[in-house]
Amino acid sequence: MQSAFGAGAAEVIVTDGGSFDRTARLAKSAGARVMLSDRLRSRRLNHAAESATGRSLIFLHADTRLPAGGVAAVHEALDDGAIFGGFRLRFAEPQTKLRVAERMINFRSAITRCPWGDQAQFIRRDVFRQLGGFRELPIMDDYELALRLRGSGRSRILPQTVITSGRRFLQKGLWRTAWTNWRIIAKYHAGGDVEELAKMYRR
């Protein structure tokens, strides 16, 4: 949240799905607008986007930090013809295995033009509304949005880097996590049940 203001955001909306910590209070004290919403992430993001007033939207996970000048970089990309995109990614933790994971993720997004949610997806607000926002899925909502926009030829991966948490890779292991992610992607494309995919992700 602080990184969003530091990156130049004029409006920061925090969606709280019923947390029991001090998230809402801290967000308000920092100058953000707080919305209490559903626990389903895609629905929370859609509610926040509906109330946003800017011409562009940046969806920032709680454990992801925007770089200085990140908002200006988004506006520049949108002014240059992009309608959707994300940033390169770096993990906050120092472990060597995370450097490998970063390279894999950044290579994947550069090739596919499908940034995931932890890469701070951005989109023109009018385009987001025309598309009907995120599909209300328990998982893959960020990937599904990226897939819909990839065919436009106007998706952009910015050279600037967001910092995010690598705790999932550290807790579950690099190759196990990567293998699980690719299995979920493959099953999603094969028409797998998203509720089952969400369970697979949480295991």
Predicted feature residues:
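Short, acidic, metal-binding catalytic loop of nucleotide-sugar glycosyltransferases
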Residues: 1-9
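A conserved acidic beta->alpha catalytic loop
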Residues: 3, 16-24, 64
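Acidic donor-binding/catalytic loop of UDP-sugar-dependent glycosyltransferases
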Residues: 22, 42, 60-76, 147
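Glycine-rich, basic loop-to-helix element that forms the pyrophosphate-binding segment
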Residues: 29, 36-52
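Short aromatic/hydrophobic "clamp" motif used to bind/position activated sugar donors
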Residues: 57
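Conserved donor NDP-sugar-binding/catalytic core segment of glycosyltransferases
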Residues: 68-97
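Acidic donor-binding loop at a coil-to-helix junction in glycosyltransferase catalytic cores
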Residues: 139-145
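Hydrophobic helical membrane-anchoring modules
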Residues: 147-203
